Amino acid sequence: VDRLVADASVDDYHALLLPGGTMNPDQLRMDRDAVRFVKDFMASGKSVASICHGPWTLVEADAVRGRRLTSWPSIRTDLRHAGAEVVADQEVVVDGQLVTSRGPSDLPAFCAAVVEQFARAHHPMPG
């Protein structure tokens, strides 16, 4: 989708995938519009998937408190401090609408879980 996040509406999307790596999440968590969009997406109950360092953006959006998830090892302390229950020994953790994974070596399991979760979330858009 080619749209600025400032112009994006949660209503226009079925699901959200937050990228991993260090640069993408670091840039997203510093962008006020991106953080607002992620916060609104989580509040909507729609499916969200995140891998590796991606949950940093969820932390910034105050969207991990009381959630079970996993991530790259170096950000697990950030997740715990934000109120998350971190699961370190699973390739993929599904907590309701949220799918998370640890990193690149878990991509096959993550992709399968995301496809399953996003397929369940597909509903016709109004209009």
Language model regions located:
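Active-site-adjacent pocket-lining segments in enzyme domains
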Residues: V1-G127
